[in-house]
Design a protein with these regions (language model features):
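Hydrophobic beta-strand signal
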Residues: 23, 188-190, 212
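Charged, cofactor-coupling segments
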Residues: 222-230
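Non-heme Fe(II) oxygenase catalytic core, chiefly the N-lobe of the double-stranded beta-helix
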Residues: 2-19, 28-185, 198, 202-206, ...
């Protein structure tokens, strides 16, 4: 069920904190959605570093998107990463159950309890301690309708309340309560990164573009900085 952004009230926020996710109206008009889609289709297909794109930086700091993030993280939150996800007939993949455990940082620096490290699209990524991830928020803005037929996100409510889970723990985790997050064009899925989530290949391949923005409200330990702070 989609909830209008104006109904983002404490009672509904409490439900989000319990479940770890919510589907809401992103508050973007059709013109803004069209312009955003056209920009990404022509200039930034498959982009992993979206916050390097001026229009996406403007979107992330807009009042419309901050109206979604601030009730969860507070008024001092900021965007730290942006990714474009799309499933098409040519790129129609399955994503196994997992948590989002890595952050993008400016440079590598050895921090106790942090690791492993990797480089994706030229950017340093690291798994921090779970307290960093648990206080973050993902805002997934849908540029196309998305349902079970074209690879919609599936989630396990409440699973974000656990620490990092191993592969075997994820495989054994009860998933009877798992649900599909159907979303319409213009909807946003708000999600805690530690929430167990997955997606299946699209049964009916069609464009399923999602602008995935990650927000945080905490500075990182001395010696390491966010790649972006928008």
């Amino acid at each position: 069920m989609t909830t209008d952004v104006k109904d983002w009230v404490p009672e509904y926020l409490s439900k989000f904190q319990d479940d770890g996710y919510a589907v809401v109206d992103a508050g973007l008009d059709s013109g803004a959605l069209f312009e955003l889609g056209a920009l990404l289709d022509t200039e930034h297909p498959g982009e992993r570093n979206l916050l390097g794109v001026p229009a996406i930086r403007e979107l992330a700091r807009s009042e419309t998107i901050r109206d979604l993030a601030c009730p969860v993280l507070g008024d001092n939150c900021f965007a730290v990463r942006g990714i474009l996800f799309n499933k098409t007939e040519e790129a129609n993949w399955k994503v196994a159950w997992h948590q989002d455990c890595f952050i993008a940082v400016a440079a590598r620096s050895e921090i106790p309890g942090w690791g492993p490290w990797s480089i994706k699209a030229g950017v340093h990524h690291v798994r921090p301690t779970s307290d960093v991830i648990s206080r973050m928020l993902a805002v997934r803005i849908h540029l196309d309708d998305c349902n079970a037929d074209n690879g919609a996100l599936r989630v396990v409510p409440w699973s974000h309340k656990y620490d990092f889970l191993s592969v075997s723990q994820i495989q054994q985790f009860p998933k009877k309560s798992a649900g599909t997050c159907a979303a319409k064009r213009g909807d946003a899925i708000l999600m805690r990164p530690l929430l167990l989530h997955s997606s299946s290949p699209a049964k009916i391949p069609s464009s399923r573009r999602v602008v995935h923005l990650e927000f945080a409200a905490d500075e990182l330990p001395t010696g390491v900085e966010w790649r972006h702070r928008v």
